[in-house]
Structure formats: C-alpha cells, structure tokens
C-alpha cells in the first residue's frame, strides 16, 4: 500500500492508496477522499488517477491533466493562488520498531553518524524529565499530527511525526516506530513491541478467569492473663511485731521478776521466731517476684504471637481491598496495557457495582474475641490492658479502600459541586473499568453548562444506549425529549414484566442525576425516585444539599471538603463513616474512555465468527450480476435438497439451512428479540432460496400479521405469491388466510389425484417431463410475529400448524418467527418444528423456551444466532448474512457511509460510491439489487409468475364500474371475495330474478350509499319509460340527489303524510290494473307480459331508506308495504329498503326480501339473526357487506361514483345524473303522485290546471286526491249554493265563479254584493250588472225575464220541431254574495219572483249562485228559501258537521277546514277541493 502526501499552507495530510482505488479526489467536501476546506477549487477539484501501467499517477484539474507523479516524486500546483504540493511514495511502506529506552537523544538526519540515517528528514529527539521532546530543523519541514512544527514540542505516545515519505510514532516511552517507503539505516536496536495476550488480540477482548481473593474471616481469640497472685497481706513488721512485743514483755518481766532459765528459753524462742519469720518473708517475696516476671514474660510472648497473627490478617484484608478496589488512576494504567482485569466483574459477581469512594478505617472482616471473664472480681493490670489494646487496634483496618454498593436503588452524593463532579468521574471510571458494556449502561443527566466536564465520558462504550448510536448524555431539552422517552419505555416494559422478580434484566442501567430540574416534569422520575430495585436500575443523585434528594435514597455520601467525606446513611441506617478522598486528575480520562471504546468485548464461542457478513460476502461475490442465478435455477433440484446458505460460522465456513424433509425440515421456528436481526435473517433466507431455485420450484407466502414490511423488498419477485397481512385489523384475517391456504392444499391434492402421485417431488418430475401442465413449487409459509398473531388469533395458528402438518408431502413448509417465544410455543408447534433458530433472546427463560437451554440469552451481536435441528443433531452458532447492507460495486469497502457522530446518534453525511452522481442519492441495498437481478433473469427466461393463493383484502373504497346494458340483465354491485376459490370477482344482481332487496347495518356503514349504487346502476341501463323510482327518504336525506334522476317519479319525506296516503292508493290501483292486464294476456310475470305485449309496462322500484321509522310511526303503511312486497314482484314492482335493526322488519316482509345485503352491525347478533352463521364477519368498513341470496358472499359494495372522498363522490353522482338527464331528455318522465300546490292562485289554476274549458262548466277548484279541476256542471245542476260561516272564503268562491263565468261570455250576470261590499271591484265591469238597490234588482229581473221568455218561446217551437237538443244559450246568471242581504233588500213578492224564475227558466240558461250562512238557508219558510233548499249542488267552506242542508258523512273529531279549501257537494256526495285565490 503506497501513500499520497498532500502539503498545503502549514498542514500535511496522508492518504493510503489501495489497489482498488482508481481515482482519488482532493476537494473541499466531506465526501472527497482528501478534504481541504480552506481551498475554493474554483477551477475544479484535483483528481489523481492511476495509469494502466500502475507506475505513474496522472494529476488532473477540472478534467484537464496538469501533471504526472512518479514514485518518490512530488508536484506543486497553484490552486486559486495558493500552493499545494502532492507527493507519492510509490512503493509499499515498511515498518521498523526501535528500542530507545537507554537513549537520551535520537538524531535523525543524513549524517552517517546519526542514529537514524535518512535523506528525507532532519530533526532530533531528546528525553527531558522522562518525556521525549522533538526539536525540528529549520531547513527540513516536519509535521506533528498534520501541523507543521516550528519549535520544540513534548510528545505523547501515539503522536505522529510526518516528513516526506516517512512517519515516526512513539508506541511506548521506549519504543519508536518508523514507517518508510525506503530502507532505513539505524544504529538503534530493532525489536518487536512486547504484546500481552490481550494486546495480541486487540481490539478483540474476552474475559479471562477472574482471580478473586477472599477477605479473611478467621476467628482470633485472645485470652486474658491469669490473675496476678496476691502477695502476703501482712508486712514484715506484722510478722515480727508479735514476737518482738512478747520479747519486750518477757524482758520487762525478767527485769521485774527474773525467772532464770524460763526467761532465757522464752527469749531464745521469740528471737528464733523473729529470725525465721524474717527469713520466710524474704524468701516468699523473692518467689512472688519470680512468678510475676514469669507471668509477664509468657503472656507478652503470647500477645506478640497474636499481634503477628492479627497483623497478617489485617494486611491480607488490606491487600484484598486494594486489589479488588484499585484507584481510578491505577485503572487508567491498566486500560492502556489492556490488562486482563478489564471488565472482570459480571452481573453474577458478589461485588457487582461495588465501587471505591475513598479510603477509611474499616471494620476487620476477621473476628477478634477477648476472653473477658469476670472483670468485676479482678484488678486491671498492664498485661490485661495490653491485650485489650491489641484487640481494639486490630478490630479495624486503617486506610484501606472504602466501597459502597450502587447495584440497586438510589444513593445520594452531597457536597460542593466541583467536588461531587470529580468523585462521579471516579465512580464512572471504576464501573466502566470493571463492568462490561454488555452488563452495565450509563445515563447521565446534567446541566449543559457542565458539558465540558462530562464530555470525555461519551467515549465510554457504556454510555451508548442499547440498539442505538445515541449516547446516554441528557443535558438539554432536545436530548431529554429524544432519548428519555425510549429509555422510559424500556423501563416500563421491565416494570410490567410479570416475572421481573425471577429474572435479572440486562443491561443494568446506572442513572447519574446531577441536574434534577431537567427531568422534573418527566414521567421517568416515577422509576428513578421510587423503590424499583427489581427492574435493573441504579440511581446516583448528586446535589449540593441533601434536602434536594428523594426519600428513597438508601445510601448518602457527604463530601466535607476536597480531602474528607462521610457516609452519613448506609442501607437506610445512620452510619457516619468518615473517609479520605482519593487523589485523581482529569488527565488521561479521555484516553481511558477511548481505549475502552476501542475494545470489542466478545462473549461465548465467537472467536472465528465474523461480526458482520453481508449477503454478497456470504455468496463470495461483490456484484449482484455475478450471482449464478440462471445456472442455479437450471441445476438446483428441490427433490434432492433445499439447502441454501444463511450465514457463516467461521471466516469461510458457510452455514446452510435445508428444509428438505430428510434434512432440517420441513418446518421450524425462528426467535429473536427486538434488534436481534430476526427479520433480516428471514429476508436473507428468502433471498437465498430465490437465488438458488427456480420460481416454479420454490415460492413464498409471507404472513406478516401487522404489516411490518418484511415482505416489501420482495414485492415484485416472481417467487413471492403474496403477503397475508392484517394491517387494517380485519376480523376475517384468520378465516381468509386459512381459506386461502386450505384452497391451495386442496388444489394440490386434486392435481396429485389427477396424476396419481402422492408426493410433490413425483409431481414435479411429471411436470418437467411435460406430462403435467401446471407447476407446483415448494410453498414456504413464513409467519412473522406469530406470538402476537397467536394471542389475537389462536385458532388461526392452530389450524395453520395443522394444515402445514397435512401439507408435508404436498410441498408446504412452515416457518414461525417471534420475538417472545415464552407461552406461545405449545406442544403442537414444538413437535412440528424440526429446526429452531434463536437469535438474541431477552433472558434465559426465553432462550430455554426455544433451545431448551439459556445460550441465546448471552448473544450480544445483532445477527448472531444458534441453529438447532432435532434433539441437538445440529447445534451451531453462526452469524447470519445481512442482505440489507448498502450495495457497493466499487470503492473502499470500509467506507459504506460517512456519518457525523453526535450525542443523539449518527447523522449521515453522504454515501460513498465511485459514481459521483450516485453518491448524492440514497444507495440501494444488496437485497434490492439481488431482487432486481432475479426479476431481470425472470424476464430473460420469459418465466410466467404463478397465480397467488392469497388475494389481497377487499379495498375499503371501490368505484362503480361503467354501466352495463339492459340486455345483460345483471348488474355488478360490488367486488365479491372468495378466498376458498382463490377468486375475487364482481357480484351481480340478476335483474328481475333476485327480487326485493333488504339492506341492513348499523348507522354510518353504507346502507344508503349501497341503495344509491343500485339505483344508479339500474338507471344507467334502463330509460325512464322502462323504469320508475319512488324514493322514500326517511333517513338523513342521503337519497336526495336521486330526486333529480329522470327515472324518479316521486320523492317522499317522512312528513309527507298525504302524499304517502296517495301513494298507497296509487299502488293499489296500479297493481289492480296490472293484474287485469296480465289476465288479459294470460301471463303471470312482468317478464312474460312485456315479451308478449306491444305496450310495455315499466318496472317500478320502491326505494325506502330507514324502514325502522315505518314500523315505529307508520303501522298502516307497513301493512300495505308487506302486501305490496308479497304481490308486487311478479307484477314488476320491487322494493329496496334499508334498516338498522332486524326487528324493524316483520317476518312476513322479511320473507319477501329475496336478496339481503348485510353491512356491519355493532351488535353481532343482528347479523346472525339475518343470515345465520357465516365463515366471515363484516368488518366495520363503510360498504363492506355480506350478500345473502342462496349463500353469503363477503363483498365490498361499489361506490355510486368515483371519488377520493364523499364530497367528490357526491359531485360525480350529480354529474352522472346530469348525463342521464341529457341522454333521456326526449323520453317523458314518469308521473309523480299528484299533490295540491301549497298556494293556488287563480292565474295558476286557469293556466296550469284548467287546460280545456267546456261550455256549461265552471271550474271552481282542484280535487285533493286527483289534483284535477272540479267544475260546476250548469247543464245538470243549474244552481249552486256557497255555504260557510263569516270570513271563511265564501266571497272568494263567488269571485272564482264570476271569473269562470266571464270567460264563457254570458248573456247577463246580475251581482248582488254582500253587506261588506267584497265584490265592489266588479261594479264597473260592462258584462256584470252590479245591483245596489231593490229597484235595480227589479230592473235586472225584468230584463232577464224578457230574455228568458223569448227563449221559452224558441224552446217550445224547437220542441215542436224535435230539435230541442240543439238549442244552446249563453247563461243568464244571478249571483248573490249574501243571502241575508237579499232577504233584507227584497220583499216576499220579489223573492217569490226569483223562486219562480228558478223553477221556470233553469232549463233555459238561468242560473242562481247564492252564498250564505248555513242557518240562513234553513231557518226561513218563504218561497225563495224553500227553492234554495232544493238545490243539491253546493260548495261548502265550513265543516260538514256544521251544516244540515246536506246529509254528508263526517268523523266525530272532524278538523277545521283549512283556508283555501272546501267541499264540493253534488248529488249527496262530497269531495274536498282546493279553491284558487282570486287576488
């Protein structure tokens, strides 16, 4: 590997050239190989290209060559006015290591006397106070870590000195490494750096057997010395005094009374006594002194032995404590040496998370006991005091490490902020040194102002959060919000674990809370400040005052000053243990952390297993197009083997999974916790099968219950037959999936029976020979997250396993994958799973569930897994291949991506690729490229993709297809789902055959929309002459738009009571008419009638939305509808109705609903009552329904029109109706139910309703039922009464009569107005004689009488000539607005004259119209009144019960007549009419 040197300004960059590198780019962007940010490169970036011969390098800028580089040569380039020098070593670099431990100076120059002779460098190295100092030469450039030196600088281990074509690095204080492209001549001793076993394996690190020294626990008993003997309590004088006294007495007696010999004897005796007593005393005194000295000597020797024994135990305890709890400064040194004590403690260690907080006098672990005896009965002498002193001294061990336990609960650290922060550094360093990042992780919460103090810790691997690149450093709101939530969820999951008391969670989290205010409002405090000792967390609270700490702190450490501290509380008890703080400095902290970060802790059998292997690496290729896919498809035969590689168990040792029934198969389990690589392993296996086997040999059906996206990369691959998913939460997931799978099994069984084979291998052999037409691949059913699937769909998993067991010979293989196997792998699943693959498991219990041992719980590397076949017939640990790796065709293999490392994780900067344009795009993954290659191979070989047994779930919205013609007699109303037939097709409503339709479902699930779809479909096929709609919209007006359809005869609302009554009458008449017509044609159905008759009858469809209202509020209407639904179908009258409850429709009507469309019911019993038990439920999706005719079919009803939302659908429905109106504009619309207008004026009445006026008929109003004009027939009934109370509209009736009379050009009209002169407007009319007085009335009567007499003569003559029927005269009319005024203004003679004229001239065109009160017509007995009573024609503007002129039927609770209405009475019969208003 040669090197490229780039020198500019005062900097130097070194780039190592590999054989794969073709083009090196020098620019100012991070993605460039060499980045020089201070240069603008306005003329283009510098490119260094290898020439084909490899002996020279071409230097280009902006695509133009500006020079060449030869080995050990350089070129200087002007870049935008700045100089840049590029040099190339041109040869492989060689490394030399020299021992310089005995040197005080090392000279590097071209001098033969120099320690290192070279022409490329000139500088010296001198040792000053144990540290090397580099002294550059002014004439020779020298760079330290890429920056040019101008003065002497102290060096540290690892600093790199650069000069042209050479590097100098102190790898140890006494070892100098020199890298050069030419041979180095040196007088120094060349050596190899001594490496410990750990350093040899660096950066791989594995724990070694731990040395554990036990603390002494001996029992040392110290016996007290024997009690010192009591001396003679009598002194010498007490012994001598008696005989002396006796001697003196005898002497005195002898002087007074001498006795001779007796006296002498007595004196001798007492003198002897004195002498012997004195001698005896002295001898005993000497013996006592000797015994005392012997006692002291013996006990002193005894104490010395005990002291030595206790001293040895004390030293042992001291050594053990200092060994197991070294200082943080010692640990820094250990780490640099890659000491075997790194990470020696495990979660099972007794001293797990025990840390040293300083030194103190601690109680001895050995026992010192003193035989106290009965001290109350003896004196304390110096020997006893010595024994007590020794026992006291050795009951404590002085100045040894004082540990505290931080393995559970919360501890508090109180003191000055700077002191506490420094001590936290030591605690963190100790924990990081002794505990692996597999076992312990840190989360520090501190103020952003202290970030510099905590920054070095981010390099510790323990601060990296599990399954993330983020650091456990929380110092502001952003880091808190982005990191703490995921940590909280992890703790919450642990807290909710029902077996948390029986397990140890890993990793153990140590929270360091130095700024509680940052998380004061966060929910994670419920775990940090409460007693949560069973979820694998510890908390260290740091504060300046103890009042800021939580009450659940079990240990409180107070720092008094920079040298002293005290354990105030320990294990929730007062302790007051003073201690001295350890001295430490921040120097070396970052190096310590970085060194630990570089170590890769391996656990278990992982020496030769790679940490990561991509799919293409496993396949031993770098390009997807180099995979031998075509050759594999042609050569690999499933009948022989299904073995495909899935990973490596060694560098070149491939692990294969073979699901052939004679090998590892046919079924198995895959388990792995979140982030373990389970889905990636399944994807690798699928991809490997697809690369090795033809799509007609192997196929997949992926069951991805929650739609996790595992199947997404394979969506277009020919091997993938479908993805069974329930991402929308369908109730029919399991039923549909099982139906699809069972249909596939039945299909295979049918083919086997047809070709008389019983195994898939035999069948495929027939297919390859051309004897069988359809290929049957091995079908792999892969169910991801089956634990959740089983918990929610237990019957499905049971049936799935059962189906797979049956399908063994049919070529069906089942792979179940889960995160949590505990409690979901029953005996049926276990007995059918021959192989099991377990990736990282959450705990030992989960591992035992899948492997029957706890090995998988110890896995730490993503993608690492155990393969177990049968009863450990195969048991291998391997690294599964990663198919999701970025695809790199050419380039530096180690530079897949460039990221900026932040505390929140990795932020990608760019993607490295040789193609500059591709580097700006998201790189494709290997799985994408391989799938593309598979698809391309399929196209090249023209391989047809096999049909899928699984059809996707029905979509939630489907637009109605284009209208079909009437001749089709079948209307698609929805998409029918039949997974048992592997089919999805239109559901057709057979015109006239499928009868009445009932649409049921809870509110809001598409009943009205379904009805609209049906009606629009029919309307598109049949014109308004062939099809009539009567729409009853009793719901939420959803059918209102259909009112505009040209087929809609009428539209009814709930409050249209009169119109509904008329509809009932209309339907009765229509049905009777149709029955009569059918009898005439001797047919029984509308289909036959229209086929035989020239006059076709239209189909009538009565659409009734919300039938529930009918039953509740319209019982009479319901009774009629039941009859119509029963009898109307054969007559061409059909009903479509909706209801929200089954009970809303009576059984007689329900039995006449041949087709039932059942939408979603909130109460599932409603569906059961309608159509019984069905294999599928209706999902709560608008438009989803079961259609029951003969069988129930799950269907998604089409929308009436296309549209993304309901508003767009409605707009398109309106457009469709406009289109239909234009199409059918020349066809008459069906007649609506006739209804009176809300207001009837005289002009509207005459222009709209009175279309033809016949002579002798006076239209006076509209019939309420038929809405046809009602007229007074003056030919049959020449006179008419207008009867009513005052102000009830009599005058208006008179006006209507006058207006109608005037149109007929009468001979004469005499008008007698009422008292209120309501007809005064007619006074000036030429053709009306307005009568104000009796005289004027008499005059008009005379004139009329003369005219009538002349007519009588003509009539008599005509009778004689037999032509009386041909006579016709214009009417002579006498109109009276008030009978009372007439009676008041005239006398009996005149009244009699009028009565006579009525009798004599009625047949000659004389007519009388009289208005008055009912009483006015009956109370009088004069001739006129009597004649008026004889009139049988009248218009009543009063209640029928309020008059007695006519015997008319009425009800007891007869309603008041509405203004503008009245009764037209003729011949004893009445009909209600609407009377026009004359303005």
UniProtKB/Swiss-Prot annotation:
Residues 1-235, 281-1479 are cytoplasmic. One of its GO terms (cellular component) is plasma membrane. Residues 291-321 form a coiled coil. GO terms for molecular function: ATP binding; ATP hydrolysis activity; DNA binding. Residues 652-848, 984-1168, 1267-1444 form the FtsK domain. Keywords: ATP-binding, Cell membrane, Coiled coil, Membrane, Nucleotide-binding, Repeat, Transmembrane, Transmembrane helix, Transport. ATP 1 binds at residues 672-679. The keyword tRNA processing does not apply. The keyword Isomerase does not apply. ATP 3 binds at residues 1287-1291, 1475. Residues 257-259 are extracellular. The chain crosses the membrane at residues 236-256, 260-280. Its main location: membrane. ATP 2 binds at residues 1004-1009, 1036, 1105, 1197, 1206. It is a multi-pass membrane protein. It is found in: Cell membrane. InterPro entries: AAA+_ATPase (IPR003593), Firmicutes_EssC_C (IPR023839), Firmicutes_EssC_N (IPR022206), FtsK/SpoIIIE/SftA (IPR050206), FtsK_dom (IPR002543), P-loop_NTPase (IPR027417). Whole protein oligomerizes in native gels. Part of the ESX / type VII secretion system (T7SS), which is composed of cytosolic and membrane components. The ESX membrane complex is composed of EccB, EccC and EccD. The cytoplasmic domain is a rigid structure with 4 domains (residues 480 to 599 form an unnamed domain) plus the 3 FtsK (ATPase) domains which are connected by short linkers. Part of the ESX specialized secretion system, which exports proteins from the cell including EsxA (ESAT-6) and EsxB (CFP-10). Might be the translocase subunit. Probably only the first FtsK domain can hydrolyze ATP. This is ESX secretion system protein EccC. It comes from Geobacillus thermodenitrificans (strain NG80-2). The lineage of its organism: Bacteria, Bacillati, Bacillota, Bacilli, Bacillales. The gene is eccC.
């Amino acid at each position: 590997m040669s090197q490229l040197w780039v020198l500019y300004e005062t900097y130097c960059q070194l780039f190592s050239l590999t054989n794969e590198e073709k083009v090196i780019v020098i620019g100012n962007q991070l993605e460039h190989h060499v980045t020089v940010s201070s240069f603008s490169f306005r003329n283009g970036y510098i490119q260094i290209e290898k020439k084909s011969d490899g002996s020279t390098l071409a230097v280009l800028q902006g695509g133009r060559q500006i020079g060449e580089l030869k080995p050990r040569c350089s070129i200087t380039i002007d870049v935008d006015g700045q100089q840049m020098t590029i040099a190339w070593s041109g040869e492989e670099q060689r490394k030399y290591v020299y021992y310089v431990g005995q040197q005080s100076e090392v000279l590097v120059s071209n001098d033969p006397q120099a320690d290192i002779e070279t022409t490329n460098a000139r500088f010296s190295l001198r040792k000053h106070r144990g540290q090397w100092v580099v002294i550059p030469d002014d004439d020779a450039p020298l760079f330290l870590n890429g920056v040019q030196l101008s003065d002497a600088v102290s060096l540290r281990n690892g600093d790199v000195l650069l000069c042209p074509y050479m590097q100098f690095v102190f790898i140890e204080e006494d070892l100098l490494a020199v890298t050069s492209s030419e041979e180095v001549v040196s007088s120094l001793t060349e050596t190899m750096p001594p490496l410990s076993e750990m350093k040899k394996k660096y950066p791989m690190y594995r724990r070694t057997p731990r040395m554990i020294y036990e603390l002494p626990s001996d029992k040392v008993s110290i016996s007290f010395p024997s009690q010192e003997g009591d001396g003679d309590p009598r002194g010498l004088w007490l012994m001598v005094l008696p005989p002396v006294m006796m001697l003196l007495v005898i002497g005195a007696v002898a002087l007074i009374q001498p006795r001779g010999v007796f006296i002498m004897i007595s004196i001798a005796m007492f003198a002897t006594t004195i002498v012997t007593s004195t001698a005896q005393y002295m001898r005993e005194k000497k013996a006592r002194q000797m015994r005392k000295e012997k006692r002291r000597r013996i006990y002193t020797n005894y104490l010395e032995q005990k002291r030595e024994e206790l001293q040895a135990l004390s030293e042992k305890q001291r050594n053990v404590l200092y060994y197991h709890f070294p200082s943080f400064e010692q640990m820094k040194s250990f780490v640099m040496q890659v000491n075997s004590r790194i990470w020696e403690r495990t979660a099972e260690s007794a001293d797990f998370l025990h840390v040293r907080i300083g030194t103190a006098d601690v109680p001895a672990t050995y026992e010192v006991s003193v035989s106290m005896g009965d001290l109350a009965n003896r004196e304390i002498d110096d020997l006893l005091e010595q024994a007590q002193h020794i026992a006291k001294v050795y009951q404590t061990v002085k100045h040894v490490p004082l540990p505290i336990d931080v393995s559970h609960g919360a501890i508090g650290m109180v003191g000055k902020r700077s002191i506490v922060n420094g001590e936290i550094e030591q605690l963190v360093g100790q924990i990081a040194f002794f505990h692996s990042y597999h076992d312990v992780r840190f989360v520090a919460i501190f103020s952003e102002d202290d970030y510099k103090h905590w920054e070095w810790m981010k390099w510790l691997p323990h601060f990296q959060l599990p399954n993330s690149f983020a650091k456990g450093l929380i110092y502001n709101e952003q880091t808190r919000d982005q990191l703490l939530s995921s940590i909280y969820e992890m703790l919450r999951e642990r807290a909710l674990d029902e077996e948390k008391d029986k397990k140890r969670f890993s990793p153990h989290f140590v929270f360091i809370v130095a700024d509680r205010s940052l998380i004061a409002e966060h929910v994670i405090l419920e775990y940090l400040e409460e007693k949560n000792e069973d979820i694998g967390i510890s908390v260290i609270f740091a504060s300046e005052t103890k009042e800021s700490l939580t009450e659940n702190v079990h240990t409180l450490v107070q720092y008094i000053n920079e040298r002293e501290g005290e354990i105030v509380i320990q294990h929730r008890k007062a302790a007051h243990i003073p201690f001295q703080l350890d001295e430490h400095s921040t120097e070396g902290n970052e190096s310590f952390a970085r060194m630990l970060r570089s170590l890769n802790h391996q656990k278990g059998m992982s020496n030769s297993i790679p940490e990561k292997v991509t799919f293409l690496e496993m396949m031993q290729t770098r390009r997807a197009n180099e995979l031998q896919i075509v050759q594999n498809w042609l050569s690999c035969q499933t009948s022989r083997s299904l073995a495909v590689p899935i990973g490596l168990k060694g560098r070149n040792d491939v692990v294969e999974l073979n699901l052939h029934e004679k090998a590892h198969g046919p079924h198995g389990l895959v388990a792995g916790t979140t982030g373990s690589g389970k889905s990636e392993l399944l994807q690798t296996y699928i991809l490997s099968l697809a690369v090795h086997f033809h799509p007609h040999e192997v196929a997949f059906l992926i069951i991805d219950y929650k739609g996790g996206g595992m199947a997404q990369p394979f969506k277009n691959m020919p091997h993938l037959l479908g993805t069974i998913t329930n991402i929308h939460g369908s109730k029919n997931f399991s039923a549909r999936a099982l139906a699809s799978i069972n249909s596939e099994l039945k299909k295979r069984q049918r083919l086997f029976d047809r070709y008389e084979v019983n195994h898939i291998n035999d069948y495929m052999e027939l297919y390859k020979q051309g004897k069988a037409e359809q290929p049957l691949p091995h079908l792999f059913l892969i169910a991801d997250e089956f634990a959740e699937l089983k918990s929610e769909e237990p019957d499905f998993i049971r049936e799935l396993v059962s189906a797979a067991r049956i399908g063994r010979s049919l070529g069906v293989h089942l792979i179940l994958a889960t995160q949590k196997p505990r409690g979901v792998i029953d005996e049926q699943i276990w007995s059918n799973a021959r192989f099991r693959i377990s990736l990282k498991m959450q705990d030992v219990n989960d591992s035992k569930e899948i492997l029957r041992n706890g090995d998988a719980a110890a896995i730490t590397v993503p993608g690492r897994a155990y393969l177990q076949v049968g009863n450990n017939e195969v048991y291998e640990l391997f690294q599964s291949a990663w198919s999701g790796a970025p695809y790199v065709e050419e380039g530096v293999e180690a530079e897949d991506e460039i990221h900026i490392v932040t505390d929140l994780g990795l932020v990608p900067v760019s993607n490295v690729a040789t193609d500059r344009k591709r580097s700006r795009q998201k790189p494709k993954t290997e799985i994408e490229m391989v799938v593309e290659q598979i698809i391309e191979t399929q196209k090249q070989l023209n391989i047809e993709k096999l049909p899928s047994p699984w059809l996707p779930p029905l979509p939630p919205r489907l637009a109605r297809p284009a209208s079909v013609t009437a001749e089709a007699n079948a209307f698609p109303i929805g998409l029918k789902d039949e997974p048992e037939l592997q089919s999805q097709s239109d559901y057709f409503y057979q015109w006239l055959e499928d009868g009445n339709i009932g649409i049921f479902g809870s509110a809001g699930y598409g009943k009205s929309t379904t009805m609209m779809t049906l009606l629009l479909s029919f309307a598109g096929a049949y014109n308004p002459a062939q099809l009539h709609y009567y729409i009853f919209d009793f719901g939420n007006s959803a059918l209102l738009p259909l009112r505009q359809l040209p087929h809609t005869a009428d539209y009814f609302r709930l409050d249209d009571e009169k119109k509904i009554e008329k509809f009932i009458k209309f339907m009765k008449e229509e049905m009777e008419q149709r029955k009569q017509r059918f009898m005439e044609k001797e047919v029984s159905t509308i289909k036959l009638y229209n086929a035989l008759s020239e006059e076709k009858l239209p189909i009538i469809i009565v659409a009734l939305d919300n039938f529930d209202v009918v039953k509740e509020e319209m019982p009479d209407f319901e009774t009629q509808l039941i009859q119509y639904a029963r009898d109307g179908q054969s007559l061409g009258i059909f009903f479509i109705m909706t209801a929200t409850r089954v009970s809303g429709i009576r059984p007689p009507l329900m039995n006449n609903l041949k087709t039932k469309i059942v939408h979603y019911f909130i109460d599932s019993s409603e569906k059961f009552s309608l159509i019984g038990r069905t294999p599928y439920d209706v999902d709560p999706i608008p438009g989803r329904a079961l259609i029951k005719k003969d069988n129930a079919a799950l269907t998604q009803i089409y929308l009436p029109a296309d549209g993304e939302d309901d508003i767009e659908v409605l707009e398109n429905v309106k457009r469709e109706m406009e289109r239909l109106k234009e199409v059918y504009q020349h066809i008459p619309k069906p007649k609506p139910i006739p209804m009176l207008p809300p207001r009837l004026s005289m002009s509207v009445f005459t222009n709209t309703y009175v279309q033809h006026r016949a002579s002798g008929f006076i239209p006076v109003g509209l019939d309420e039922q038929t809405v046809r004009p009602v007229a007074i027939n003056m030919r049959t009934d020449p006179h008419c009464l207008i009867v009513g109370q005052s102000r009830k509209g009599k005058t208006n009736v008179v006006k209507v009569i006058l207006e109608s009379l005037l149109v007929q050009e009468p001979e004469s009209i005499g008008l007698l107005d009422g008292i209120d002169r309501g007809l005064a407007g007619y006074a000036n009319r030429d053709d009306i004689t307005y009568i104000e007085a009796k005289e004027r009335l008499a005059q008009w009567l005379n004139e009329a009488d003369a005219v009538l007499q002349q007519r009588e003569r003509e009539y008599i003559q005509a009778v004689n000539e037999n032509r009386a029927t041909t006579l016709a005269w214009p009417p002579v009319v006498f109109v009276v607005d008030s009978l009372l005024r007439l009676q008041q203004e005239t006398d009996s003679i005149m009244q009699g004259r009028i009565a006579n004229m009525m009798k004599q001239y009625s047949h000659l065109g004389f007519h009388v119209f009289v208005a008055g009160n009912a009483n006015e017509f009956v109370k009088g007995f004069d001739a006129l009144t009597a004649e008026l009573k004889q009139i049988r024609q009248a218009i009543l503007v009063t209640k029928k019960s309020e008059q007695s002129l006519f015997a008319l039927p009425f009800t007891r609770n007869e309603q008041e007549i509405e203004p503008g209405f009245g009764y037209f009475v003729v011949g004893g019969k009445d009909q209600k009419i609407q009377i026009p208003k004359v303005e």
